[in-house]
Amino acid sequence: PTAPPLPEPHGAAVDVSTVEGLVAAVEQAQAGQTIRVADGHYFMPRYVEIRADNVTLRSASGQRHRVVLDGARSPHGELLGVRACSGVTIADLTIQNVRWNGFKINSETNVQKLTICNCIIHNIWQRGVKGVKVPPEGREAIRPKGCRIQYCLFYNDRPKRLADDSADIANGNYIAGIDVMYARDWVISDNVFVGIQGSTGEGRGAIFLWFDTQRCTVERNIIIDCDVGLQLGNPHRADGVEYHCVGCVARNNFITRAPEAGIVTVYTKDCRVLHNTIHDPASRMSRLIRTVFANDGLVVANNLLSGPGMRNESDSKIEFIGNLIKDMTSAFADPASGNLHLTQAATEAIDKAVPLPDVMEDIDRQLRIKPDIGADELVDK
């Protein structure tokens, strides 16, 4: 997916071209300021934080691969944080080589309306984006609301090794792409995730939402060779949380080869899993969609599951509507590379979906007239 260009800065702009200048600009940023980073490879000496409202940190060129913030020489396990501010935008740059968290959202300090757009998140060995727990005191006011993670590429060159992270608590499997708690009204869309894998293939989700996350939309993402594709919830509960995800929707996503689960829902309420395409005919766990424990009001509809299908381990009554379970390898454009667009051979999916008012477009934002099952709508029928 191609990101739209950022608008020109409205407030003051600061141009930086050295590591020292970048660190100073971030830590001294004033509200409304734009920090434009010249093309280059910046070995960060330590963790830094944005702490002012409406700050934009971006590459000057708009080319995300030309500005690299590298944590390989930092003594800290985290690279770039956001604290006690609203309206921050981080865009058009790369972060890489971080032991723990690449982008750290200090959610307990009242971080709101953060946008991370058109970034590359590369070789981050715990979480590419981490939003931490929010304490009970004032939680409803300070939980992170209205954030957006869009048009980013998350990828690792190889599975995680124990040597990458001495703090790993899961035998080398403590790894995910995005992991956020107590989120509300987020949009996670148009991202690509490749190779987010633990040392034994038991990592967390490429996208992992939990701890009373509410009304979030996860759509038009492409996930390839990650241990778990999309994870709504977790078997572990604490802090008096009854449901991990409430009123969230996952729609129009492509997921290819996610051996632990393509999409898993655990302790959810009124969530919807709609029009996703999941391809993993050799799935070792046979759970392209997995539902576990309570999933009250869950709707799983019009998903194309190219492989062994679903595993329902839930105690709740779930609506399963119009899902197609069949190896569709020969009906996709290029399934080996994760391109799950339909071809004319997908006769069992074309025009066979139940019309849903929640999904009027497909993964390419093409209008669904007579809807097809899965994330793609074949236009030339």
Label each region the model flagged.
Residues I325-D380:
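C-terminal accessory segments
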Residues Q30, A52-S61, R64, L79-I124, R148-Y155, S189-V192, ...:
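Parallel beta-helix/beta-solenoid
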Residues D70-G81, N97-E108, N123-A141, L162-V180, ...:
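Extracellular beta-strand/beta-solenoid scaffold signature
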Residues A3-F43, Y47, T347, E361-D364, ...:
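Acidic Gly/Asp/Thr-rich repetitive segments characteristic of extracellular carbohydrate-active
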Residues R220-I224, H236-R237, E242-H341:
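Predominantly extracellular beta-rich ligand-binding scaffolds that present long acidic/polar faces
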Residues H10-V23, R36, R51-W100, K326-S330:
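Right-handed parallel beta-helix/beta-spiral solenoid domain characteristic of secreted/periplasmic
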